[in-house]
Amino acid sequence: QITSDSKNQVTLGWKKVSKAQGYDIYRSDESNSGFEKIASISSGSTLTYTDKGVKSGNTYYYKIAATYKIKGSAGRGSYSKVTEVAVLKQGSIYSITLGDNNVLNISWNSVANASGYELAGAVSEKGTYTTLQTSGATSFTHSNLVQGTTYYYKVRAYKDLSNGIRS
């Protein structure tokens, strides 16, 4: 499982390989070549790694190999299947207008390669944000507002693929 978000990081997760004593993580910006080892995990029970060396708007390719020590010699198992991750740019709200019947009309920019957007709102900038909409739309009408209350909004783009990637 590989997940990505708009905070310029990719989190990789994998299933434990029997008798593995660690894992090597490889990344490339090409699907078939140019892979470089970006991390060595020294524990066979560690099954996640967060790559903070990515940039939004770029596509990366990852593969993982289990590592072993057999009779004092280091060895590596076969590579996992190469997985593609598109790190999406962050969505940005460009318009919030007051509509009829005390509603707010919120619009945001589309993000290339996004399959949808999650809009969340709160009544305090650093408060708990509640998801208001998850869809492919780039606008939302927020109704049932309380007069005199200030509302805060955040939007993030995501991409769902068959391999579970979400940005």
Each model region followed by its residue ranges:
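Solvent-exposed loop/turn and edge beta-strand elements of beta-rich ligand-binding domains
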Residues: 32, 37-39, 54, 84, ...
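Extracellular low-complexity, O-glycosylation-prone stalks/linkers
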Residues: 19-37, 63, 113-131, 154
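Short S/T/G- and acidic-enriched coil/turn segments that sit immediately N-terminal to beta-strands
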Residues: 45-49, 136-141
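Pro/Thr/Ser/Gly-rich low-complexity, intrinsically disordered linker/stalk tracts
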Residues: 1-19, 56, 72-113, 147, ...
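Beta-strand-rich modules
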Residues: 51-72, 142-165
